[in-house]
From Swiss-Prot:
Protein known as: Protein translocase subunit SecA 1
Main location class: membrane
GO cellular component labels: cell envelope Sec protein transport complex; cytosol; plasma membrane
Organism this protein belongs to: Corynebacterium glutamicum (strain ATCC 13032 / DSM 20300 / JCM 1318 / BCRC 11384 / CCUG 27702 / LMG 3730 / NBRC 12168 / NCIMB 10025 / NRRL B-2784 / 534)
Enzymatic reactions: ATP + H2O + cellular proteinSide 1 = ADP + phosphate + cellular proteinSide 2
Family designation: Belongs to the SecA family.
Membrane-topology descriptor: Peripheral membrane protein
Biological process, per Gene Ontology: intracellular protein transmembrane transport; protein import; protein targeting; protein transport by the Sec complex
Length: 845
C-alpha cells in the first residue's frame, strides 16, 4: 500500500506543473473580465451553453469559464481566487482529489469546477458532511452561481420529496453523502416515475473526501423496515450481564472488538434462565442475545460510541465525532444497547435496500474531492475510486510548530496538565482548540475548565447545531474551544474571528435571508463586510502577537490522518501557530498497542504522576500502532467492498430492470417472456430424464394448474396424433404446446381487461403486479444474502475460500430470485384471469 503511494507521487509533480500553467492562463484573463459590465459578465453563461450545444467541450471553454466565475466571486463575495485556488479548481475539474491545507479556501475553490461542469445541464452534486455546511455553502457560494444565472438547490434531511425533486433539478445541488445515498435507495424503491427525485449521477465534488469515502465507507447506508415483534430477551440479558464478571464469566478482546463466553458464564446464564443447555437447538437464538448484551456492556460506551438524546440511542461516528442520524446497528446490537440504557426498544429491522458509500459514489461519471489530509490514504483512493491525489501548494509558507508529545502515567495527571497549559495560553490572549476523542472526554474536560473558571465552548455531537457559530469565534483572543475529533471541520478558524460567518449570523439575526430576499441581503452584505473584516483583522493581529492558534490534542487517534487534521487547524494561510499532544498510559491506543511495558518502566524509574516523559520509544510505538490500525482498517474496507461487489452487481441488474419497467409505457414483452420462461422451466424440470415414460407429468400438471388453468389435456398430448404417432412427442413439442396455451390464456385476460378500461388498463395492471413482486423478492434476497454472509466465514474451516463461496452461492440465489419474480408475477396475473371467470359466472347465474 505504502509503496504505491510513492509511485503515485512521482507523476504528481508533472500534474502540479500543468495546474500552475492553467492558473497563470486564468489570471492572465483577469483584466479582460474585470472590464465587463454586470450584464456582459452574466451573459457569459448563455454564451458558454450555446457553444457547448454547438459541439464545443468543457475543456475548450475551461479557461474563460474559470475567469468568469472568479470575477463573479469577487463582485458578489468580495473574494478573488488565489493562484493556488485556481489550481485546486482545475484539479477538481479533471477528476482528482485536491489536497489543500486547512484555511486555503476549499469552499471558494469549489465554485470554479462546479460552475464549469454545470454548464452542460446534467447536474453537479457538491457533497458535504452535514446539513449545516450544505445549507451554508448553497447560500454563500450559491450567490455566485445565481448571479451568473444558474439554479442552486440544497438537500436537507427534513425536506419533502417534491422539495428534493426541485433541488436535484437545479444546475448545482448541495447535500450530504447520507441524504444523496438514501435518496438513491428510495428512488429505487419508487413505484412510479412521479415518485423519483434524483435525475442521474453526472459529476460530484466531495468536500472532506477522506472523511466520506474512507472513514464512513465501512458503514453501509441501509433503508430498513421493522420486523414484527421485539424480543423480551433484550431486557432479560440486559439485567443478567451486569451481574456477570469479566474474565470470570466472559472475556473481551478490545483490539478485535469481540467477546467470548466462558464455561462459568454459560453455567451462570443457564441457571438464571432455568434451562439445561444454552447451546441446545431450541435455545440457539439466546446465544446471540447474550453476546450482544456483553458487547453493549463492554465495547459500546455512552457519549463515545453513541449518545442518548430524547430517549433515543444515536450512533456517534468514531472518526468525526458527529451523530450518524438515521443509522442503527444491525443484527440486534442496537436493541441490546437500548435495553442497556433502559430506553424504548425499537423493533428489529429487516433490510429493504442498502448500498455502501464506496459503490454509491462509483455511480458518478466523474468524481472529485477536496481535503486537507489525503496523503496517507492516496493509495486507497486510487485503488478503490481511481482518484489521484494532487497536493496543491499553500498560498503562503506554513509557520506551524509541532511540539513534542508529553506522556503522563494517568489520565488525571494528563488532564490536570492540560488545564494548566490552557490557563497559561489564555492569560496571554492566545486562542486554544482542544481535541478530544469522545463526547464523554470533552464533557469531563469541560467540567475541569469550569472549576478553574476558564470560559470555553464545547463542540461535540450534542452541540452540533451551534457548530458554525462556535468555530467562527474560536480564533478570538483567549477563546477556548473543546471539540471531539473533527467536529467543526469544514469551517475555518480565522484568527480574530471569521468575518463572513460572523456577518452572516448578524444579518440573519436582523431577519435577512439570502434565499428569501437576496437583494436586501446582498445590499447589507456589501455595506457591512468591510467594517467586519477590519474589526476581525485588528483582533487577528493581537492573536498573532500571542502566538496564533494553539491546538492541543488530549489523545492520539488510531489514524494518523485524524491527528494531522487536528493539527492542520492551526497556522492557516501563513499565520503563526503551534500544536501539542498530551497522552497518558491509560489512553485507549496506548492500552491496546503499547501495553503495560512502558507503564512498568515509568513505575521502576519512580516517575511521579504529574511529571511527563518525552520518549522516542513511546513516539515510535504510537506510530507503529497507528500504521498497524490503518492497515487493518484498509483491509476491512477492501473486504467490505469485495463482498459488497457481489451485491453491487446484483443491485445494478435489479435497479436497472426496475427503472426500465418504470419508464416503459408498455411492459407486455416482459410479461410474455416471463410466461414463456416460467412454463419452459416447469417443462424442463418434468422432462429432465429424457424418455416420455420417465417424464413426471403429474408433477408438471400440478405445477401448471397452480399457475393457470391449462386448456390442454396431457393425455391427449402424449397419446394423440397431433405430433405424429403415439409416443413420439418430444420435450420441445410439449414446451411449445404449453407455452402457446399459456399465451392464449393470458390473451383472454388482456381482452377482458381491455374491454373494460382499454389496453392501457392491462398495461397498468401488469406494472402494479410486477413492481411489488420485484420489491418483495429483492427484500427477501437481501435477507438471505445477509444470512449467507454471516456464516460464510466457516467455509474456511473446510479449506474453501469464503469469498469465492459467497460469490458462487450468492449468484445461484440471485438467479433463483429472478426465477421467483417471473413465477410469482405470472401466477398473480393468471389469478386475475380466474377472478374474471368467477365474476362472469356469477353474472350469468
Amino acid at each position: 500500500m505504502f509503496g504505491l503511494s510513492k509511485v503515485l507521487r512521482v507523476g504528481e509533480g508533472r500534474a502540479v506543473k500543468r495546474l500552475h500553467k492553467i492558473a497563470d492562463q486564468v489570471i492572465a484573463l483577469e483584466d479582460k473580465f474585470a472590464n465587463l459590465t454586470d450584464e456582459e459578465l452574466k451573459a457569459k453563461t448563455a454564451e458558454f451553453k450555446e457553444r457547448i450545444a454547438g459541439g464545443e467541450g468543457l475543456d475548450e471553454i475551461f479557461l474563460e469559464a474559470f475567469a468568469t466565475a472568479r470575477e463573479a466571486a469577487w463582485r458578489v463575495l468580495g473574494q478573488k481566487h488565489y493562484h493556488v485556488q485556481i489550481m485546486g479548481g482545475a484539479a477538481l475539474h479533471f477528476g482528482n482529489v485536491a489536497e489543500m491545507r486547512t484555511g486555503e479556501g476549499k469552499t471558494l475553490t469549489c465554485v470554479l469546477p462546479a460552475y464549469l461542469n454545470a454548464l452542460e445541464g446534467k447536474g453537479v452534486h457538491v457533497v458535504t458532511v452535514n446539513d449545516y455546511l450544505a445549507k451554508r455553502d448553497a447560500e454563500m457560494m450559491g450567490r455566485v452561481h445565481r448571479y451568473l444565472g444558474l439554479e442552486v438547490g440544497v438537500i436537507l434531511s427534513d425536506m419533502r420529496p417534491d422539495e428534493r425533486r426541485e433541488a436535484y433539478a437545479a444546475d448545482i445541488t448541495y447535500g450530504t453523502n447520507n441524504e444523496l445515498g438514501f435518496d438513491y435507495l428510495r428512488d429505487n424503491m419508487a413505484r412510479s416515475l412521479s415518485d423519483l427525485v434524483q435525475r442521474g449521477h453526472n459529476y460530484a465534488i466531495v468536500d472532506e473526501v477522506d472523511s466520506i469515502l474512507i472513514d464512513e465507507a465501512r458503514t453501509p447506508l441501509i433503508i430498513s423496515g421493522p420486523v414484527d415483534g421485539t424480543s423480551q430477551f433484550y431486557n432479560v440479558f440486559a439485567q443478567i450481564v451486569p451481574r456477570m464478571t469479566k474474565d470470570v464469566h466472559y472475556e473481551v478482546d478490545e483490539r478485535k472488538k469481540t467477546v467470548g463466553v466462558k464455561e462459568e458464564g454459560v453455567e451462570y446464564v443457564e441457571d438464571q434462565l432455568g434451562i439445561d443447555n444454552l447451546y441446545a437447538p431450541e435455545h440457539s437464538q439466546l446465544v446471540s442475545y447474550l453476546n450482544n448484551a456483553i458487547k453493549a456492556q463492554e465495547l459500546f460506551t455512552r457519549d463515545k460510541d453513541y449518545i442518548v438524546r430524547n430517549g433515543e440511542v444515536m450512533i456517534v461516528d468514531g472518526f468525526t465525532g458527529r451523530v450518524l442520524a438515521g443509522r442503527r446497528y444491525n443484527e440486534g446490537m442496537h436493541q441490546a444497547i437500548e435495553a442497556k440504557e433502559r430506553v424504548e426498544i425499537k423493533n428489529e429491522n429487516q433490510t429493504l435496500a442498502t448500498v455502501t458509500l464506496q459503490n454509491y459514489f462509483r455511480l458518478y461519471t466523474k468524481l472529485a474531492g477536496m481535503t486537507g489530509t489525503a496523503e496517507t490514504e492516496a493509495a486507497e483512493l486510487n485503488q478503490i475510486y481511481k482518484l489521484d491525489v494532487i497536493a496543491i501548494p499553500t498560498n503562503r509558507p506554513n509557520q506551524r510548530e509541532d511540539l513534542t508529545d508529553l506522556v503522563y502515567k494517568t489520565q488525571e495527571a494528563k488532564f490536570a496538565a492540560v488545564v494548566d497549559d490552557i490557563a497559561e495560553r489564555t492569560e496571554k490572549g492566545q486562542p486554544v482548540l482542544v481535541g478530544t476523542v469522545s463526547v464523554e472526554r470533552s464533557e469531563y474536560l469541560s467540567q475541569l475548565l469550569t472549576k478553574r473558571g476558564i470560559k470555553h465552548n464545547v463542540l461535540n455531537a450534542k452541540h452540533h447545531e451551534q457548530e458554525a457559530q462556535i468555530v467562527a469565534q474560536a480564533g478570538l483572543p483567549g477563546a477556548v474551544t473543546v471539540a471531539t475529533n473533527m467536529a467543526g471541520r469544514g469551517t475555518d478558524i480565522v484568527l480574530g474571528g471569521n468575518p463572513e460567518i460572523l456577518l452572516d449570523i448578524k444579518l440573519r439575526e436582523r431577519g435577512l435571508d439570502p434565499f428569501e430576499d437576496e437583494e436586501s441581503y446582498q445590499e447589507a452584505w456589501d455595506a457591512e463586510l468591510p467594517a467586519m473584516k477590519q474589526r476581525c483583522e485588528e483582533r487577528g493581529d493581537k492573536v498573532r502577537e500571542a502566538g496564533g492558534l494553539y491546538v492541543l490534542g488530549t489523545e492520539r487517534h488510531e489514524s494518523r490522518r485524524i491527528d494531522n487534521q487536528l493539527r492542520g487547524r492551526s497556522a492557516r494561510q501563513g499565520d503563526p501557530g503551534s500544536t501539542r499532544f498530551y497522552l497518558s498510559m491509560r489512553d485507549d491506543l496506548m492500552v491496546r498497542f503499547v501495553g503495560p511495558t512502558m507503564e512498568n518502566m515509568m513505575n521502576r524509574l519512580n516517575v511521579p504522576d504529574d511529571v511527563p516523559i518525552e520518549s522516542k520509544t513511546v513516539t515510535n510505538s504510537i506510530k507503529g500502532a497507528q500504521a498497524q490500525v490503518e492497515n487493518q482498517n484498509f483491509e476491512m474496507r477492501k473486504n467490505v467492498l469485495k463482498y459488497d461487489e457481489v451485491m453491487n452487481e446484483q443491485r445494478k441488474v435489479i435497479y436497472s430492470e426496475r427503472r426500465e419497467i418504470l419508464e416503459s409505457a408498455d411492459i407486455s414483452r416482459y410479461i410474455q417472456n416471463m410466461i414463456e420462461e416460467t412454463v419452459s422451466a416447469y417443462v424442463d424440470g418434468a422432462t429432465a430424464n429424457g424418455y416420455v415414460e420417465d417424464w413426471d407429468l403429474d408433477k408438471l400438471w400440478n405445477a401448471l394448474e397452480a399457475l393457470y388453468d391449462p386448456s390442454i389435456n396431457w393425455t391427449d398430448l402424449v397419446e394423440g396424433s397431433e405430433y405424429g404417432k403415439p409416443g413420439e412427442l418430444s420435450a420441445e413439442d410439449l414446451r411449445t404446446a404449453l407455452v402457446n396455451d399459456a399465451h392464449a390464456e393470458y390473451a383472454k385476460l388482456e381482452e377482458a381487461v381491455s374491454a373494460i378500461g382499454g389496453e392501457a388498463q392491462i398495461r397498468n395492471i401488469e406494472r402494479m403486479v410486477l413492481m411489488p413482486v420485484i420489491d418483495t423478492k429483492w427484500r427477501e434476497h437481501l435477507y438471505e444474502m445477509d444470512y449467507l454472509k454471516e456464516g460464510i466465514g466457516l467455509r474456511a474451516m473446510a479449506q474453501r475460500d469464503p469469498l469465492v463461496e459467497y460469490q458462487k452461492e450468492g449468484g445461484d440465489m440471485f438467479n433463483g430470485m429472478k426465477d421467483g419474480i417471473k413465477e410469482e408475477t405470472v401466477r398473480q396475473l393468471f389469478l386475475l384471469r380466474k377472478q374474471f371467470i368467477k365474476q362472469d359466472a356469477e353474472v350469468a347465474d
